[in-house]
Amino acid sequence: MKRRNLLTAMGLGLGGAVLATPAIAQGPPQIRWPLAATFPRELDILNGGVEVLVRRVARLTGNRFVIDRDSSLLPMTDQPMLDFVGSGGAPIGLGASYQAMDREPALVFDTSVPFGLNARQQNAWMYQGGGLMLMRELLADHDVVPFPVGNTGSQLGGWFRREIRAAQDLNGLKFRVSGMAADVLRRLGGQPQRTGHAGLRTALEDKTLDAAAWAGPHDDLRLGLHKVAPYCYYPGFLEGNAQLSCYVNRHAWDRLPPEYREAVEVACADANLWVTARYDALNPAALKQLTAEGAILRPFPLEILRAAHRATEEQLEALASANGRFRKVYSSWKPFRDAQHLWFRIAENSFDRSASLQSPETSRN
């Protein structure tokens, strides 16, 4: 059975499972939706965000609109979740938009751009800077309505089997990265790889990979990457944030009562806050454990940061010149990014530096 016909075959249409009620009943309908998400079990925070979302929707609607995670709803191999949802495979699903950047390059702005925004800045652009409106306009052609639903925050720069001392060390480096980071690495002479989470540790161990960037300390610790690639570099300039998105099939969305739509929007915002805060709360302890287990932290050489920044700007400009849809989003995102970077240098970054001077960890070094 084709996935796009799943809901129709259930006799429900893309609006989801609306149970029949007598004509005299005017209350909100009873609706049940299956949810698709492919987060591996090791990613407990992202899976926890799914639970926050479904619980919140049920609570806000008095259990009349119920969303259940359905592990049998899986996109085809290499099919982005947003395409799966847009084609009718599920009424709702969670994923990372930059997985579909090969077909729609501007979707990188819905997840992460090298040297771009951090998690707070991403939320500011999405909710108050016009970003969410632009993403919804972009994804309307894909029959998807998107919502921010979580963010990993700043990530680590990657796990390497050997030290990286200069930009030339990136030449021929088989480096697992995601999204636009692959284009930047390619400009630096590296060989970007798309190895999935399940094969990461094995690929590093048997030298199929030289390095891998996954997420932050909490997730990386659970995957055990430090045990086979001990050199961990920072900052994570490739992904200063990584936003996850909730995708709702547009036809299913249009059939929802207004109060149910609002419940989804509120629940996604709650999950977005919960996931981001959870990562911030657990990453420090995970970083300590990583170093206690032998991880070797190293700052990226300034030469590499400068070369990567230059490559990023070149790639952004090239995409903007070649793609009108990318250019439209970029023209909003770039001035917002530049203004945020200036403000954060004056306020947030200077405060962080001064506050860290008084921290117990700093005073012992």
Task: Locate each region found by the language model.
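An N-terminal domain-start capping segment
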Residues: Y127-G131
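N-terminal secretory/targeting leader peptides
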Residues: K2-L19, I24-Q122, L132-N365
